[in-house]
């Protein structure tokens, strides 16, 4: 009789411990408690009014790049928004594009841009 009660109590103890571990896992995984409040301060809703105010208040006598708010002499001189992961290519028609480096070997992204411009890619 004692073995049955002991076995039952041990079983309940293991179930309770397992359930607590699962809840802790989900709380950790989905940012429960204090961490969630901290992350909410950083994840604010998108608000274009900040960008519009910054754009309107920028001082530039030539061309103000819309993506980076850099002041350049002509539009195709605008820098890429993420130069660490993008390469810029000036096209012959006075425009420019930024292309993800994407792990290509040096010069490979430029070659692919040229092939695409010729309709070969």
From Swiss-Prot:
One of its GO terms (biological process) is ERAD pathway. InterPro entries: LCL2 (IPR034543). It comes from the Eukaryota. Residues 1-21 form the signal peptide. Keywords: Signal. Belongs to the LCL2 family. Probable component of the endoplasmic reticulum-associated degradation (ERAD) pathway. This is Long chronological lifespan protein 2.
